[in-house]
């Protein structure tokens, strides 16, 4: 009950308006003001700028430019594993999908069908499969990479709420990740289909993919979908470790994998910090 009480103010906040305003401000070029905002952000969240391809704070013209900064080559080596972590962040939850339900936090599950935008046929492909939910904090690197090789088959933008997605909110808001705005990316891989979902949150100005660019805004009320032929000559093909998208202000990634002999890294546990490229899982 205490967790639900702690998130009560989020139900009352004008989250859409706050997010639109934050996105507007973060995209403006304000010279020394922008530099000072970035400097304070780096100090508050202890961002490691030595890993950034551009370590000079003054080189970033906008806050979004800084927030989606690239890393230096080689600072995130790829592990020898079938699936690697697609982000820097922290493990929220991971495990099996049972009876169309995904574990969110103690006392909370949510529907796989709802998560993917109501597509029951798509959700059925992951019955008895596996999921992993990874949280990106403000200090983290905010580009998302591929956990394995994949060919894009479909992308869906699902409008929704914009609750915060931090651990406290995950424990206090039922069905959080299936309620928030999200971009659902469906890929074909040598091991079958998998889904990588970018979940929006309060202050997340937008989400973008490398093949489409900015997906949102616009923020309408209808689900939007784009189909891609994974076998076409011009198919979108991304290799393990390649960038697939980014958050313009942070959030959460949820991945779905079909039933099979998938074994997660034995070192993984909820709350553990992770880095892009580390071993996530292997097939037996």
Curated annotation (Swiss-Prot):
GO terms for biological process: phosphatidylethanolamine biosynthetic process. It catalyses: a 1,2-diacyl-sn-glycero-3-phospho-L-serine + H(+) = a 1,2-diacyl-sn-glycero-3-phosphoethanolamine + CO2. Binds 1 pyruvoyl group covalently per subunit. It holds the Pfam family PS_Dcarbxylase. The record marks 250-251 as: Cleavage (non-hydrolytic). The modification Pyruvic acid (Ser) is found at residue 251. Keywords: Cell membrane, Decarboxylase, Lipid biosynthesis, Lipid metabolism, Lyase, Membrane, Phospholipid biosynthesis, Phospholipid metabolism, Pyruvate, Zymogen. It is a peripheral membrane protein. The active site is at 88 (charge relay system), 145 (charge relay system), 251 (charge relay system), 251 (schiff-base intermediate with substrate). One of its GO terms (cellular component) is plasma membrane. It is found in: Cell membrane. Is synthesized initially as an inactive proenzyme. Formation of the active enzyme involves a self-maturation process in which the active site pyruvoyl group is generated from an internal serine residue via an autocatalytic post-translational modification. Two non-identical subunits are generated from the proenzyme in this reaction, and the pyruvate is formed at the N-terminus of the alpha chain, which is derived from the carboxyl end of the proenzyme. Its EC number is 4.1.1.65. Pathway: Phospholipid metabolism; phosphatidylethanolamine biosynthesis; phosphatidylethanolamine from CDP-diacylglycerol: step 2/2. Its main location: membrane. Catalyzes the formation of phosphatidylethanolamine (PtdEtn) from phosphatidylserine (PtdSer). Belongs to the phosphatidylserine decarboxylase family. PSD-B subfamily. Prokaryotic type I sub-subfamily. Heterodimer of a large membrane-associated beta subunit and a small pyruvoyl-containing alpha subunit. NCBIfam families: PS_decarb (TIGR00163). This is Phosphatidylserine decarboxylase proenzyme. It comes from Polaromonas sp. (strain JS666 / ATCC BAA-500). The gene is psd.
